[in-house]
Regions:
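FIC/Doc superfamily catalytic core
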Residues: 1-144
Length: 144
């Protein structure tokens, strides 16, 4: 249905909507994780390719990487790729480029401040992820 309705919008308007969504989505997604760039500063970085004074380089990379990751997800959807471990690792690598080593399972324990949940250690996480994808495939094939 989305693609049907999308076809009724002229290409310039559609492109404008998509560009606005990409910018707003990137800003909001990185802001919720603590990024201090404003929406206007995010626009300057992403659309004008300019850095913003007084901001950490990490924050610049976060918004640039988020935009790349969003486009990667759109590409995977357009190519009708199934969500799998490879795609998730690719996304992690894109999101963390120039920040930390990404696309691999962590080897050290982590904590979530203020949360009662303790994330699994590296090896346990690997097993849980494998089980998740097996369960996902099973649910897709079963009638629920």
């Amino acid at each position: 249905m989305y693609n049907q309705k999308k076809g009724s919008i002229d290409s310039i308007t559609l492109s404008s909507y998509e560009q606005d969504f990409e910018l707003t989505y990137t800003h909001n997604s990185t802001a919720i994780e603590g990024n201090t760039l404003t929406l206007i500063e995010t626009k300057v970085v992403l659309e004008d390719g300019k850095s913003v004074g007084g901001k950490k380089q990490r924050e610049i990379y976060e918004v640039v990487n988020h935009k790349k990751a969003y486009r990667y997800v759109k590409k995977c959807i357009a190519e009708e790729k199934k969500l799998d471990e490879h795609i998730v690792k690719d996304l992690h690598a894109i999101l963390t480029e120039n920040i930390i080593v990404g696309g691999v399972y962590r080897s050290e324990p982590v904590r979530i401040s203020g949360a009662g949940h303790t994330p699994p250690v590296g090896n346990d996480m690997y097993i849980q992820i494998k089980n998740f994808y097996e369960d996902l495939a099973w649910k897709k094939d079963s009638q629920i």
